[in-house]
Amino acid sequence: MLLDAGPQFPALGVGTFARHHHHHHHHHAAVAAAAAAAAEMQERELSLAQNTFVEPTHMAAFKLNPGGGSGGGSGGGGGGGGAGPNGGAGASGPHDLSPPGQTSAFTSQAGYPTSALAPHSAYSGAAAFNSPRDFLFRGRGFAEGSAAAGGGQHGLFGPPAGSLHHHPHHHHQLSHAEHPQGHLLFPGIHDQHAAASQNTLGGQMRLGLPGEVFGRTEQYRQVSSPRGDPYTAAQLHNQYSPMNMGMNMAAHHHHHHHHHPGAFFRYMRQPCIKQELICKWIDPEQLNNPKKSCTKTFSTMHELVTHVSVEHVGGPEQSNHICFWEECPREGKPFKAKYKLVNHIRVHTGEKPFPCPFPGCGKVFARSENLKIHKRTHTGEKPFQCEFEGCDRRFANSSDRKKHMHVHTSDKPYLCKMCDKSYTHPSSLRKHMKVHESSPQGSESSPAASSGYESSTPPGLVSPNSETQNPNLSPAAAAVSAVHNVSSGASGALASNFNEWYV
């Protein structure tokens, strides 16, 4: 009786398990093996065929050999026997997965010799796979003996040493014998160094999971994920801005670079660029003139902050809380408390020890109060309500509420220094200042020309005697030239940088 299990599992690409052998002395053994395999497939493998984790594209790479081992009995012995109709080797050949007298269960659909699907041919006889479940999910069968294969750690993902290249009589089975690597079942996984081969495929294989890496080796399990803690990542990136905390997302695809971790390279952090942080604190007891700063260098922000706090700021015995950092704009003006001095020094050192804990934000702050206010942008909290009766406006901080209160009163404390206009909110004043910046010709009648406002044409490009030098100058051009002369003469008395006036 012939049993054909192929129609039961079309997604697996499963063909018939066995055929009636032409040799009479193999008939009973073949029928018994086929019956056992069919029963096992019917009972255990029906769920595998419907499993969503096993993609047909992966399973189509394997099929059962309908008659691959027919030459094992008659021509077997020594050289490997005769080949079957589909190119399967004989039972005694070096590429047979089955023991003598049993039909070879699997062959590669692309014409691979069966030894390419196992670590080495010596183990193939002991690892007979009678069902796709045994073949696909027996991780042990692919891991044991990998060291003896000469570094070929995964036959499923690339041709291991001794599987394709040292059997020239099977190269005719490959559709592209010149480039056997073109037939890699999983070309994204490259061959790795032989030292890592003993840790390969130690557990169950998973097929068809996007993003999963097959054959994950032990030495890369401790590599941190690129999706690290945003709290720590933001703190490191902003505290040490010159440092390269990015990750190399380009995988190396050279087949000859065996020392690279291959697919794991994109998850490895690059070494940080070393930087030097210099202490510019000036000792007030120095007798030198000009006084020299400390100039000690540190490799981390923590070391610099500790040095300044211990060596220069001092402990509670210090009564004067003065910043002596080089070129400090306070010019020796003391603080009322030590914590205020510590917060001020962060302006010089660049320390920002308070990162936003919300994922994806990445902002860091030098003061905890600023972080508290910033977190309200994520939570939507607005605890400051307008105190004017009938107004329901709420704000995240008190300063915004104070600016809003001028809308309800007649106060307009934000004055324009170019004209006599005033505004209730600084944003309105900033919009107004753009009018002065963008209207150079209107400056003839505006106070901007006489108060030192610089027009769009640089005064240096206009000659002071342009009226007398060019008698053909039109009256309008002469008026514009006169405006430029007045503007250039008074520019030293009044600054023109509006950003310095209004913050």
Swiss-Prot record:
Chain intervals with Basic residues compositional bias: 164-174
Localisation: Nucleus; Cytoplasm
GO biological-process terms attached to the record: anterior/posterior pattern specification; cell migration involved in gastrulation; central nervous system development; negative regulation of DNA-templated transcription; negative regulation of neurogenesis; negative regulation of transcription by RNA polymerase II; neural crest cell fate commitment; neural crest formation
One annotated GO molecular function: chromatin DNA binding
Region entry Disordered, spans: 61-112, 146-175, 427-476
Polar residues composition-biased segments: 100-112, 463-473
Main location: nucleus
One GO cellular component term: cytoplasm
Record keywords, A-Z: Activator, Cytoplasm, Developmental protein, Differentiation, DNA-binding, Gastrulation, Metal-binding, Neurogenesis, Nucleus, Repeat, Repressor, Transcription, Transcription regulation, Zinc, Zinc-finger
Zinc finger C2H2-type: from-to: 277-312, 321-348, 354-378, 384-408, 414-436
InterPro entries: GLI-like, Znf-C2H2_ZIC1-5/GLI1-3-like, Znf_C2H2_sf, Znf_C2H2_type, Znf_ZIC
Entry-linked SUPFAM superfamilies: beta-beta-alpha zinc fingers
Role description: Transcriptional repressor that inhibits neurogenesis and induces neural and neural crest differentiation. Regulates anteroposterior patterning in early development by inhibiting expression of the nodal genes through the inhibition of vegt. Required for gastrulation movements and for proper anterior neural and axial development. May also act as a transcriptional activator. May bind to the minimal GLI-consensus sequence 5'-TGGGTGGTC-3'.
Record comment regarding domains: The C2H2-type 3, 4 and 5 zinc finger domains are necessary for transcription activation.
Name recorded for this polypeptide: Zinc finger protein ZIC 2-A
Protein's organism: Xenopus laevis (African clawed frog)
Lineage of source species: Eukaryota, Metazoa, Chordata, Craniata, Vertebrata
Gene behind this protein: zic2-a
